[in-house]
């Protein structure tokens, strides 16, 4: 679709009442969150040109200037099938021993974004929880169709495990975290690590935040939020079409490309999965958690009432649902990194 997709003409919080295309009942957006969501109108369909033009202006310099308590090191993760990919590692300036690491995989529908864009919202964890943050510059679709990005993340985990001691990282405390379009890459990397018997130490835990897990886009939440939310069904299908090179919804798709296609979720790292009540990813996230439980894997699941996709990125803990979501994530990370 052209980058000239029109701005959505209705307020998101009133879309169910105003948009005649919305015929299914659906939960309302949280009243305290609604003014913030409504103040950010977006094109009805977020195409690849629009998403790639969206630049938050985050650089290594801006991160370090705002956070003098951390240091940064850039590494190249070698790949057998392509050029190396960059891995940024943020560590405390002072540490007393090997630290846990959060291996972060950025969002952007697998078609946009970069390894630095979300770091400002994460970097205080370095000091608060005493950990290292690693963020990988995986290859994007459609230039590199799935599972290329997931393979990059898997290679990054293998490299990190192998070099953990020299990096000041505890190899038994590697937690992988994917947000939105980064979540299927995190989930796929866990499947790869299980199937390939990752060298050194397995991934300890996985964190899948507002996860983009299912290319079939046919759940109740997919239909409820086809229109009238920032990341809607139109945009979701567009991103999957790019990621899967035209194979979306077919049988020619593996679980490394689309984790929801996996039939065996046994022997996986314990998981934290969360989703917003008012987003297309809600029901696929719940089903993935249920399938983990069915297969004997452990998962903590949260569905946040009244939230939209990545609602807690507003980083306003005074909004009760935002504060609760942020607190739950951090409490889980503390438990994982201390257990």
Q: Which residues are covered by each model-predicted region?
A:
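A glycine/proline-hinged amphipathic helix-loop "lid/cap" segment
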Residues: 1-90, 338-339
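Short beta-strand-to-loop junctions in surface cap/lid or active-site-entrance loops
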Residues: 87-98, 260-265
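Short beta-strand element of the alpha/beta-hydrolase
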Residues: 98-107
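Alpha/beta-hydrolase active-site loop signature
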Residues: 109, 138-145, 213, 308
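Short amphipathic alpha-helix adjacent to the substrate-entry channel of hydrolases
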Residues: 116-135
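Alpha/beta hydrolase fold serine-hydrolase catalytic domain that processes acyl esters and thioesters
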Residues: 171-173, 187-339
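Gly/Ala-rich beta-loop-alpha elbow adjacent to hydrolase catalytic centers
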Residues: 178, 182, 186
């Amino acid at each position: 679709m052209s980058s000239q997709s029109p701005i959505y003409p209705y307020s998101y919080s009133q879309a169910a009442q105003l948009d005649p295309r919305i015929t299914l009942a659906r939960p309302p957006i949280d009243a305290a969150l609604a003014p913030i969501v409504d103040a950010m109108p977006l094109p009805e369909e977020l195409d690849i040109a629009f998403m790639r033009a969206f630049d938050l202006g985050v650089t290594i310099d801006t991160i370090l200037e705002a956070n003098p308590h951390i240091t940064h090191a850039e590494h190249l993760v070698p790949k057998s099938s392509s050029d190396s990919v960059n891995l940024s590692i943020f560590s405390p300036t002072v540490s007393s021993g090997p630290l846990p690491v959060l291996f972060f995989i950025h969002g952007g529908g697998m078609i946009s974004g970069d390894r630095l864009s979300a770091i400002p919202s994460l970097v205080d964890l370095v000091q608060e929880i005493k950990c290292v943050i690693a963020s990988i510059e995986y290859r994007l679709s459609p230039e590199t169709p799935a599972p290329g990005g997931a393979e990059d993340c898997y290679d990054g985990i293998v490299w990190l495990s192998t070099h953990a001691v020299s990096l000041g990282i505890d190899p038994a405390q590697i937690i992988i975290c994917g947000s939105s379009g980064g979540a299927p890459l995190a989930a796929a990397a866990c499947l790869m690590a299980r199937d390939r018997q990752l060298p050194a130490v397995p991934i300890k835990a996985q964190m899948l935040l507002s996860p983009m897990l299912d290319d079939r886009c046919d759940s109740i939440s997919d239909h409820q939020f086809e229109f009238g939310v920032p990341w809607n069904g139109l945009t979701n299908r567009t991103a999957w079409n790019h990621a899967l090179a035209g194979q979306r919804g077919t049988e020619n798709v593996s679980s490394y490309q689309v984790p929801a296609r996996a039939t065996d979720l046994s022997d996986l790292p314990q998981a934290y999965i969360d989703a917003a009540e008012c987003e297309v990813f809600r029901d696929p996230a719940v089903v993935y958690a249920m399938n983990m439980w069915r297969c004997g894997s452990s998962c903590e699941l949260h569905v946040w009432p009244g939230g939209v996709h990545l609602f807690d990125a507003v980083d306003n803990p005074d909004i009760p649902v935002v504060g609760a979501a942020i607190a739950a994530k951090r409490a889980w990370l503390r438990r994982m990194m201390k257990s």
